[in-house]
Amino acid sequence: MNDLILQPILFMGVLSFVMMLLMYTTRIPAAKVLEAEGVDLQKLSHPAQLGGVFPSKVERVADNYNHLWEQPTLFYAVVMVIWALGHTDTIHLVAAWAYCGLRCVHSIVQITINHVWLRFSLFMLSWVALATLLFREVVAAFIQ
């Protein structure tokens, strides 16, 4: 059972890979359009210079990809600790898969309808799942 906790990490890796592919399949055509319009892309080499240059849909995909390198890094670390200490149980598995599902739906919402309150709700629910993993492991590792 312990190794099953690693599957959600692989799922998140696949989600990140899919978002990377979407980012490049939207950004490269948009960059070619800008270049054809005479925009010097080299002057946009820093992310802070890109704000508002690309269409919103293109930016949302890139933003989502970047988001997958923020909060999920804590998820990866916590899951690895759970696995390394052999603490995997049903609650950990449910929370880890809930986290993955919520982050996946969050990604879909962000790159499509981008409804702010729905995204925020999904983000907060994913934090509940992550906090469940984190604090159960803190108790298991330090208190018991």
Which residue stretches match the model-derived regions?
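Short membrane-interface loop/juxtamembrane segments of multi-pass integral membrane proteins
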Residues: 43-65
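Core segments of transmembrane alpha-helices
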Residues: 66-81
